[in-house]
Amino acid sequence: MLDPKRVRTQTEEIARRLAIKNFEFDIATFEQLEERRRAIQVRTENLQSEQNKRSKSIGKAKAAGEDIKPLLEEVESLKQQRGDAEDELRSVQESLNAFFAGIPNLPDDDVPPGASEDDNVETRVWGTPREFDFEPKDHVALGEQLKGLDFEKATQLAHSRFAVMRGQLARLHRALAQFMLDQHTLQHGYTEAYVPYLVNANTLFGTGQLPKFEEDLFRTAGDNPLYLIPTAEVPATNLVADTILDDAELPLRLVCHTPCFRSEAGSYGRDVRGMIRQHQFDKVELVHIVRPDESTQALEELTGHAEKILQLLELPYRVVTLCGGDMGFSAAKTYDLEVWLPGQGKYREISSCSNTRDFQARRMQARWRNPDTGKPEPVHTLNGSGLAVGRAMIAVMENYQQADGSILVPEVLKPYMGGVERIQ
């Protein structure tokens, strides 16, 4: 959530910057709500002041032997008017809160302009795509040949956009997740966390999925529904919700391996083949909680940690800086890592790394005590995939495939595969 004080004092500038994210800030509605809030607040304060004066007059009148009944009636009337004004003020404040809840984060100054993914900017490229002396297959064909991927059975069990993995491909999937966790905890200094896969609405509000993106979520039935997490970013970042951290606790780096669940409501007809876009998929998620002056550098570090996984797997990839129109709701700046998939002949997203600055922290009341001022201030939060496990498996399958349809196991994964060097 944006700082309301800043929105009030820099309204035109806020609207200009939000336009970079293709968001139209409704200045007229905001100013109308603000004008009502201020007017009602002044009226409430005046009524309170008048009530206090009348209450003091009662004591004086009583001591003087005067009839206090008229004063009591006045105080009661003022009390009723003040109560009505406070109710009206709460109603307007709720409208303002709902208005603010729907406003996305401001983009950083160096975010490139643009309307869609076509306007994203390639930042760097690592590795060279392999030249095959045969026509490379995609992961679907490879998985079917190896009898390790079964989409038909998954559809029978659940619905489309699910997968069943068996044998050495299931093991490869597990090995990738374990390798990622070990790299991040042992080499990059993250603390591993196990988190709930179901969370409440307040938790999803904190990270920005609710109220705007409810259609993308799976929820339980009943009066107090829970939601399946779309990413471990949600519970992991909220571990510091409603908390004032000591300076010594920062920076905090967390890593989680969880399944993720998304309805893909806006993805009809996109990536219907294979595992690229699933309702259920595994992801190793990285979360940073840092001091405000550290978040710019923290984004570079977090992105580098995700890149290291791809480098160790020797998978060609590129880093793109998302333009304003392609950025997520909570993000101030985002890098996407896109891995080369020979079966598709193009780069595909495998990680998205974002700095949300104090946007999520304000929504979830996550603060730290600034040692210079002694006062609580919002922390900055960052998140990124390190990596999406299923897409990493796809990349390994397609980049390490052989002419006979077998798949060589990357060197760094062999210890996790029990010595298996080739999946066939």
Curated annotation (Swiss-Prot):
Cross-referenced InterPro entries: aa-tRNA-synt_IIb (IPR002314), aa-tRNA-synth_II (IPR006195), aa-tRNA-synth_II/BPL/LPL (IPR045864), Ser-tRNA-ligase_type_1 (IPR002317), Ser-tRNA-synth_1_N (IPR015866), SerRS_1_N_sf (IPR042103), SerRS_core (IPR033729), tRNA-bd_arm (IPR010978)
Predominant location: cytoplasm
UniProt: L-serine binding residues: 231-233, 285, 385
UniProt binding sites for ATP: 262-264, 349-352
GO BP terms in the entry: selenocysteine biosynthetic process; seryl-tRNA aminoacylation
GO cellular component: cytoplasm
Keyword ATP-binding included in the entry's annotation: yes
UniProt pathway annotation: Aminoacyl-tRNA biosynthesis; selenocysteinyl-tRNA(Sec) biosynthesis; L-seryl-tRNA(Sec) from L-serine and tRNA(Sec): step 1/1
Catalytic reaction equation(s): tRNA(Ser) + L-serine + ATP = L-seryl-tRNA(Ser) + AMP + diphosphate + H(+); tRNA(Sec) + L-serine + ATP = L-seryl-tRNA(Sec) + AMP + diphosphate + H(+)
E.C. designation(s): 6.1.1.11
Example GO molecular function: serine-tRNA ligase activity
Cellular localisation: Cytoplasm
HAMAP family, alphabetized: Ser_tRNA_synth_type1
Function: Catalyzes the attachment of serine to tRNA(Ser). Is also able to aminoacylate tRNA(Sec) with serine, to form the misacylated tRNA L-seryl-tRNA(Sec), which will be further converted into selenocysteinyl-tRNA(Sec).
Similarity field: Belongs to the class-II aminoacyl-tRNA synthetase family. Type-1 seryl-tRNA synthetase subfamily.
Record protein name field: Serine--tRNA ligase
Organism annotation: Marinobacter nauticus (strain ATCC 700491 / DSM 11845 / VT8) (Marinobacter aquaeolei)
